[in-house]
Amino acid sequence: MSLISRLKAVVAGDDFLDDDFDELDYASEDEFNGNDDLKQNYKKSNALSNSNPFEFMNNNRTSNVVGMPGIANSSSEVNLMEPRSFDEMPQAIQALRERKTVILNLTMMDPDQAQRAVDFVAGGTYAIDGHQERVGESIFLFAPSCVNVTSSFPEEASPSNVSSKKTSQYKFETNTTPEPAWGESKLSAYN
């Protein structure tokens, strides 16, 4: 077909000269009626379009709710751990995530590793808005946010420990400024 005849057909509105329509295959009505899957899909799509769109959204929202571990049961658990190495610290973090209180007795660890362990578990406790307390020498309490930690020291408040006469065990001389670590100071006001 020449360019001029094609332009005439387009301007005249003659759609029969377009060859693309001849290649389309149409499904016969018998094939469409025989396919049950298409009917079921059509019924489902109509049911969704006729339903309330807000009701459909509310059904999806309830499926996104995730329960917190440890909330369903009303009993509390306390884990007492005596780790020997830093490798056991993720167990303490996992217990805190499960909303369990953890008491760490770090007397069996090297002091440097114990400091590292306390920093690690304290960071995990802070991340879950928990609480931490030092209970004793190398013994620490870490609790999740659902546990209230209060501290009171009855041995300091008891009258048997309070002495009536306050005496100082330190004796001060007239010059109370300490010597600087780098040697004599010429700028001292007490010289």
Curated annotation (Swiss-Prot):
GO annotation, cellular component aspect = cytoplasm
Q: Quaternary arrangement and interactors, per the entry?
A: Homodimer. Interacts with FtsZ.
Compositionally biased residues, Polar residues: 153-178
Which cell locations does it reside in? Cytoplasm
What's this protein's function?
Answer: Cell division protein that is part of the divisome complex and is recruited early to the Z-ring. Probably stimulates Z-ring formation, perhaps through the cross-linking of FtsZ protofilaments. Its function overlaps with FtsA.
Matching entries from Gene3D superfamilies are given as:
SepF-like protein
Domain of life according to the entry: Bacteria
Name under which the protein is recorded: Cell division protein SepF
Q: Which Pfam families match?
A: SepF (PF04472)
Chief location: cytoplasm
Q: Which UniProt keywords apply?
A: Cell cycle, Cell division, Cytoplasm, Septation
Q: Where is this region: Disordered?
A: 153-191
- Family, per entry: Belongs to the SepF family.
Q: Which parts of the chain are coiled coil?
A: none
Q: Which organism is it from?
A: Prochlorococcus marinus subsp. pastoris (strain CCMP1986 / NIES-2087 / MED4)
**GO biological process, any:** division septum assembly
